Amino acid sequence: MNFIDVAKIYEKIEATTGRLEMIDYLKNLFLSTPPEILDKIVYLTLGNIAASFEGIELGVGEKLFLRALSLATGIPQERLEEEYPKLGDIGKLAEWAVSKKAAQSFFTEDLTVERVFDTLSKVARATGEGAQDLKVRLIAGILSDAKPLEARYIARIVTEKLRLGVRDMTVLDALSEAFLKGRAYRDKLERKYNIYPDIGKIAKVVAEKGIKGLDEITITLGIPVRPMLAQRLRSAEEIMEKIGPRIFAEFKYDGERMQIHVWKDGKVKIFSRRLEDITEPYPDVREYVSKAVEGHEVVLDCETVAINPDTGEILPFQELMHRRRKYGVEEAMKTYPTVTYAFDLLYLDGRELLDEQLDDRRKILKEILKENEKARLVQYEEIDGNVEELERFFEHAVEMGTEGLVVKDPKSIYQAGVRGWSWIKLKRSYISKMIEPVDLVVVGAFWGKGKRAGTYGALLMAAYSPEEDVFKTVCKMGSGFTDEELARMPKLLEDYKIDHKHPSVISNIEADVYFVPVKVAQVLGDEITLSPTHTCGWNKVRKNAGLAIRFPRFMGWRDDKGPQDATTEEEIIEMYKEQLKVVEVEETKSEEEA
Ligand SMILES: Nc1ncnc2c1ncn2[C@@H]1O[C@H](COP(=O)(O)OP(=O)(O)OP(=O)(O)O)[C@@H](O)[C@H]1O
């Protein structure tokens, strides 16, 4: 197939304003393409040379392209640079340059689609020393045999500026028209695309085998499935009304979505929410997840969070991103170790599970997942009709450092690529920050792990209630200490240690060690949230709930303060209410803006 036939259709597509017309042109293009190269045509039409999840970038800069154009046409680069602004588009420039040269030569070879495609693949894959020169030579090679119109599109494709406005969905429409008897199988085609988003391969299969070909498309290890997404509602009550009384309420971890493919021999590939291959920066995840599903082939849907290695607490999302940026992987693995929570199973040992109910998928997932310290099953609760229970679980989830809940319909199938109502998220809506530190009393401690073995990993902190003359817990604090402070801590607190909870402390939490409430520390958190466990503010803001400080950090000891000078319960309640007002204002503001 000659590239000029494709270029002519691109020219028509470029000129059209009607979507149906565009689909028609594409349909004709696809029908006139030999099936065995239809994948190549589809990738090129989308301005690419592979499925987008492969992340292969042509990425040829304009400067480099002008060098190639100059080499191919004999027109000096300065001259091209002069002409470029007048034409305003790299494609038009290439067309102009090649037409000037074409006037003087007659012996050019016809360019085939295969040759253009293979050359572009080589351009994309050229790396290392001499890669730039090689790219220039490769591009110049096809440009010297190109007709002006061909040069226009080659220029735009290599510089990633094709902009025909053809998207995956348009290609699916055209494929339906061309090979699947119009619209009858359009939905099925899209479902297949959602589980196998390599649109070139799909095109080839339906061109070669028609409707029967559709059935051959299945979940395949190494090809990412488009993830199912969640809707959002504002309250537990609304959610229960929407889904029905029986639900799965799952922690909504604030980390990175990971679709993890594991082969029988332990090989692993990890895909992000946007289907990028993120296997490389997560050697730890590869290891512990493959161990947890040893002997099986699986596709797991998971969320991976960074944790504080010393306390096991979940850290905010940003900390995980160090993996991709600031730190080297090795160092990030130590400073920000991860835990992966699996919440769905899409494929097991050759069997596609998408059409099974969540109830059943979960059962199978539980059976095959041999949990270890780092590869865990999502924390969830099955709730039947009790809105209050759902609210409480939400508060618990927030207190544990998550964003809230994803509530799911146990009877639902896995809808790849769809934001449906069988998954609904309930997020904490506070956006305000806690800007003022508080002074809290140490009433207990928990032994540390890892680097903190032998000292405390976290302290149990309480606010003071002058009316009742008691201390009520408001957070577990495990961050913000220097190594020296940590090392000194057992000794520093030794004098206050007792073997039971002090009678003036009101707590629902069992600590490893208890103290007489004396030592005061300054603490800064991210915000104050409702809590099903902490006793500060209990029943005073909401029935059966207290208040907790989220992500508390140690700012220093307040040796100038005694326990009665600590921040009071009433002050914490006030801060919580203030914060709510700020949120309401911000929410109205953003609603007005929307
Ligand atoms: N138990 C869970 N089930 C499903 N998704 C979860 C779960 N825990 C955490 N998540 C994360 O929450 C997201 C679900 O929300 P949604 O589908 O709306 O994604 P989003 O558009 O990225 O939104 P958000 O910004 O709220 O994460 C998932 O993409 C996933 O990364």
Swiss-Prot record:
Any one GO MF annotation of this record: metal ion binding
Catalytic activity: ATP + (deoxyribonucleotide)n-3'-hydroxyl + 5'-phospho-(deoxyribonucleotide)m = (deoxyribonucleotide)n+m + AMP + diphosphate
Uppermost EC category: ligase
Database matches in Pfam families: DNA_ligase_A_C, DNA_ligase_A_M, DNA_ligase_A_N
Superkingdom of this protein's organism: Archaea
InterPro entries listed in its UniProt record: ATP-dep_DNA_ligase (IPR050191), DNA_ligae_ATP-dep_bac/arc (IPR022865), DNA_ligase_ATP-dep (IPR000977), DNA_ligase_ATP-dep_C (IPR012309), DNA_ligase_ATP-dep_cent (IPR012310), DNA_ligase_ATP-dep_CS (IPR016059), DNA_ligase_ATP-dep_N (IPR012308), DNA_ligase_N_sf (IPR036599)
Keyword match Metal-binding: yes
Cofactor(s) this protein requires: Mg(2+)
Keywords associated with the record: ATP-binding, Cell cycle, Cell division, DNA damage, DNA recombination, DNA repair, DNA replication, Ligase, Magnesium, Metal-binding, Nucleotide-binding
E.C. number(s) listed in UniProt: 6.5.1.1
Residue sites binding ATP per the record: E250, R257, R273, E303, F343, R419, K425
GO BP annotations listed: cell division; DNA biosynthetic process; DNA recombination; DNA repair; lagging strand elongation
Active site residues per record: K252 (n6-amp-lysine intermediate)
Family (UniProt): Belongs to the ATP-dependent DNA ligase family.
NCBIfam families named among the record's database cross-references: dnl1 (TIGR00574)
Function: DNA ligase that seals nicks in double-stranded DNA during DNA replication, DNA recombination and DNA repair.
Protein name: DNA ligase 2
Source organism of the structure: Korarchaeum cryptofilum (strain OPF8)
